[in-house]
């Protein structure tokens, strides 16, 4: 049994450390998917279980609490699409409770911390926990000045223009409001509006949305505020950030004031004085849940007195005076009608169950996630059997679970109801979007086959195309000034043939297509004559490009900047590189061996590159690209007499005489290999001020450490 599965009380200290490392990474990954990408892969119940296990291990082994522990962190880092906003007061998360006993413990803890006896009554508020996107809206002198998402709790994303389109949120406050007001609450999409939007999408032949929460979050992150306005988003106010003056001295009074200022507040909020009353209201809200026109995943309890809230204070990432009482997962039995495959922006093929409509928790469910091919077969993430090894087949009667109002999932199969004629599901070997090969890679770290099946279509797969284009123009690839994420989205979505950019070659034909078009880019909002002229100049400057940048820009899986340089240096010209990849297609022979023998490449990378070139449409796109650009012959490092040729070098800390990129380029030109991490194979660590764990590791492995000046002296300035 692995450390991730073993009961907490049975863990050794070493196993606990390993489990905490795994949980920190897994929770951070899911935080990014939920808060950053609005695309959760697991249910709230599964996520909460991960966090509870992390907290339990930390409680038993307090000395092992990590710097990156989920118990010290809120949400996920803000995206780079919107400008960052630092919150005047952090937007913290709430601790969760899952049972009546947990709620009783929470209330008892409040009394204990304050030194109150049970007969010294403390009032609490109880309100539905809205399943939406947390928002902080700032007003100064009665006018809205900014709106930001939660982000990581400290820094969020500036979405002011989009928030202004939500009719329920006032643009100005009445004369009696304080000079500085930060209203916090939840942006959400009503169930009725969500169903209407999906009906519209289906009528237009477009893919429907998964659930109201993700749709609301995605709508709010639109670069075009007109799209946000069309989505009919709504808002509930329930908290505050910075306030120059407080209109009330209780939680209940503050929310009442928000309502008087014109903000929507939840009508189910109550002020209660006992655990029994709190739990009764929880049950009452649970009964009303199916009839509400918005998704909720629990009930939030808060100490009502602001004075007592201040005395209770905060833990590292949550207040002591509040908790969220989550609803349990809800299940129902229905028939699996079909399995569809959706392709994500990274090329991942995700199976989606199409179900006979069934009501789960008051909501009609017709789709459910099936995660990946192994999940369908009855195999877990670590190769262990799940559902006692029972596979899932089309036609099966299945148990569907809906936890926390997120995407439902199939948790079990009723074998007794399986028809004798049923057959095991065959996961597709080609991409349903573009027809390219679909493969399961070998994980470099574990050596095992990944659970995720990915499309190898690259450039030509529409599902991946925009992300590939953004990578293509990124700083270490083509680095085209004026062509960022926002512009790529605009060009990709355009229906005008003179403006469309669907593949990399389209970037370089844009100016020619515009010359013969009546619809000029310079006349479109956000561009203008000067910026368009600069954009064309920036594109034309990149027609000649270093070979390693060209290879990196192709977006081949596992090929990062360093690997691209190794490949460029080994093959010299693009013609030789492409010919070598095609000759290596059988994964055997001299060309395959040559590729595998490049130091720093290895079989996983080699296989990924060869698979990319086995796809005819990738080769076709590259052929068109080569009509427009000229990859330059790779410069071979002048290593004659170099004291660092063949050595592995790591730079850490601050460098004063070079940028990190300049130092790296110089070392590589002298025949050194520059690495981002220290290992026993590292030869030299160049440490500047602020060097941290890499310097410690270098000393641990007895690696030669030198200052920047000593390094310059070694290489001759």
Swiss-Prot record:
It comes from the Bacteria. It catalyses: NAD(+) + (deoxyribonucleotide)n-3'-hydroxyl + 5'-phospho-(deoxyribonucleotide)m = (deoxyribonucleotide)n+m + AMP + beta-nicotinamide D-nucleotide. SMART domains: BRCT (SM00292), HhH1 (SM00278), LIGANc (SM00532). One of its GO terms (biological process) is DNA replication. GO terms for cellular component: cytosol. NAD(+) binds at residues 44-48, 93-94, 127, 150, 186, 302, 326. Keywords: DNA damage, DNA repair, DNA replication, Ligase, Magnesium, Manganese, Metal-binding, NAD, Zinc. Residues 639-717 form the BRCT domain. GO terms for molecular function: DNA binding; DNA ligase (NAD+) activity; metal ion binding. It holds the Pfam family BRCT. Gene3D superfamilies: 5' to 3' exonuclease, C-terminal subdomain, 6.20.10.30, BRCT domain, DNA ligase/mRNA capping enzyme, Helix hairpin bin, Nucleic acid-binding proteins. Zn(2+) binds at residues 431, 434, 455, 461. The active site is at residue 129. It is an enzyme of class 6 (ligase). Its EC number is 6.5.1.2. Its cofactor is Mg(2+); Mn(2+). NCBIfam families: dnlj, PRK07956.1. DNA ligase that catalyzes the formation of phosphodiester linkages between 5'-phosphoryl and 3'-hydroxyl groups in double-stranded DNA using NAD as a coenzyme and as the energy source for the reaction. It is essential for DNA replication and repair of damaged DNA. Belongs to the NAD-dependent DNA ligase family. LigA subfamily. This is DNA ligase. It comes from Rhizobium rhizogenes (strain K84 / ATCC BAA-868) (Agrobacterium radiobacter). The gene is ligA.
